Amino acid sequence: MARIGKSVRTVNGDNQRQMLVRKDVAALFIGQAVGYVAGVTQPSVKPFATGDKFAGFVAYQHDNIMDDEKKPNVLRVPVPGSVHVQRNGNIFLLAEVDLVAGEKLSIGTGGLSVNKKGKGLEDINAIAETDATAGTLVPVTLEVI
């Protein structure tokens, strides 16, 4: 699942990072669970959470789920602390409630992130691969839309 971006450059002093990555690749961080969403029309990435520990690149897809907010199978998983990336590229999310395999989860600050154009809100969504109880790590597949 993991894909490597072309380069990573740390901007000293302000703890920000700039990365040249493919459009369908995001860099996820752990510690305070930082994620970066690649822009669609440019090779730069934009933050949707805060933190500083790099965990690796993973494939992702955008999905705007604002219209799905009231559906019971859409779960907003808050960060920090929700994103866990294993070295082999597997992704785990911390379940805030009991989950059933196939339920949808979202990654972002309060479940939300600024989109690529700076307008509106987007999520990176994932599908739970297994049943899980609240407080446990759930292996997920990033949703293809």
Predicted features, each with a name:
Residues 1-145:
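Surface-exposed, low-hydrophobicity beta-strand/loop segments enriched in small/polar/acidic residues
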